[in-house]
Swiss-Prot record:
Component of the SOSS complex, composed of SOSS-B (SOSS-B1/NABP2 or SOSS-B2/NABP1), SOSS-A/INTS3 and SOSS-C/INIP. SOSS complexes containing SOSS-B1/NABP2 are more abundant than complexes containing SOSS-B2/NABP1. Directly interacts with ATM, SOSS-A/INTS3 and RAD51. Interacts with INTS7. This is SOSS complex subunit B1. GO terms for cellular component: nucleus; SOSS complex. Disulfide bonds: none annotated. Component of the SOSS complex, a multiprotein complex that functions downstream of the MRN complex to promote DNA repair and G2/M checkpoint. In the SOSS complex, acts as a sensor of single-stranded DNA that binds to single-stranded DNA, in particular to polypyrimidines. The SOSS complex associates with DNA lesions and influences diverse endpoints in the cellular DNA damage response including cell-cycle checkpoint activation, recombinational repair and maintenance of genomic stability. Residues 133-143, 165-174 have a biased composition (Pro residues). It holds the Pfam family Ssb-like_OB. Belongs to the SOSS-B family. SOSS-B1 subfamily. It comes from Bos taurus. Residues 22-92 bind DNA. One of its GO terms (biological process) is mitotic G2/M transition checkpoint.
């Protein structure tokens, strides 16, 4: 007597599986490089659904609604999805049609997050190593502007020695201009003085000449 396995109990790597299921859907035929025809069918029992890969003529005979007994099958992961296969010496036998209790949910052939989780850390490590490379270039530019600003100040310092006095001269110029403005006022008062002197001198010379 062979023990039957339910769809919910199928795990990757299990062999010598014996199941009874009903065919829900038949997929498109794909041809391999060796010329074999492969068809993926969706089957189910009362515990859930799963995909089974059927080869060559057997796939052409299977129709939706067929109740089939699988003997000596095995389970494997294909493209991240759990899939049933007919092993060596295995067989698919039609034992009825339509009258079977089944459930499409859960679908055990959906992508398993555990496999994607195993691939995710590898990608994240690569991504982490990727941004680490651009970080060093960002460091030097940050230091370069500071150094450039310091160098600019340093370079301005030598002219700044001339430029350093300029800012003090600039405040000195406004007072000097004020002084010049005040000077013309003083000079305005001044010219009558010197003008009187030459006039007095002229008179004295004239008087001296008359004398």
């Amino acid at each position: 007597m062979t023990t039957e396995t339910f769809v919910k109990d199928i795990k990757p790597g299990l062999k010598n599986l014996n199941l009874i299921f009903i065919v829900l859907e038949t997929g498109r035929v794909t041809k391999t490089k060796d010329g074999h025809e492969v068809r993926t069918c969706k089957v189910a029992d009362k515990t859930g659904s799963i995909n089974i890969s059927v080869w060559d003529d057997v796939g052409n005979l299977i129709q939706p609604g067929d109740i089939i007994r699988l003997t000596k099958g095995y389970a494997s992961v294909f493209k991240g999805c759990l899939t049933l296969y007919t092993g060596r010496g295995g067989d698919l036998q039609k034992i009825g049609e339509f009258c079977m209790v089944y459930s499409e949910v859960p679908n055990f052939s959906e992508p398993n997050p555990e496999y994607s989780a195993q691939q995710a850390p590898n990608k994240t490590v690569q991504n982490d190593s990727g941004p680490a490379a651009p970080q060093p270039p960002t460091g030097p530019p940050a230091t370069s502007p500071a150094s450039e600003s310091q160098n600019g100040n340093g370079l301005s310092a030598p002219p700044g020695s001339g430029g350093g006095p300029h800012p003090p001269h600039t405040p000195s110029h406004p007072p000097s201009t004020r002084i010049t403005r005040s000077q013309p006022n003083h000079t305005a008062a001044g010219p009558p003085g010197p003008s009187n002197n030459p006039v007095s001198n002229g008179k004295e010379t004239r008087r001296s000449s008359k004398r």
